């Protein structure tokens, strides 16, 4: 309860109601927490996955994949000793930082289950555009890279619980990233790619050696939710 109060205050959220449930003895291991959020639409702000436009910069608000990697190592006995912690963080302050620079932002999405890669494919399909990523620009901790390398995982498809994916006109991108670097949870924000007219509905990655490869579309079993 103390942790929830602390985080709610940090995020500027009021907890206004609550109830309890009754479960059979031995049927519950831990605490169930279910929330419903009610908020306000910001005046002058319109964002949607359908609004991505060719020429937009693709931004992430920090290094990716840490939460999914952390949960995977905690749940499975791989015998891997890696220094990885979750990226879990409240995001409203990060959104406010973005909108303090400009309200001309086309997409703001959290990259939870399925990670950044799933979000990018959803946006590419919704907006009928292509997305080209620069592999060298994608921020991934070395420990996460190491775990992914050993297990054959793609960091772009690991869940994040404290990261945003932002699509904004290219002329605003550097200013947005500079502002994010001042934030508590977005010091590793980076421009990782751009929206294109080519290959609508697809995400292409330019590798470190300059080759272009198609990011495999999402498939298979995603890491289960914790709920």
Q: Which residue stretches match the model-derived regions?
A:
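Helix-biased detector of long, well-ordered alpha-helical tracts
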Residues: 1-227
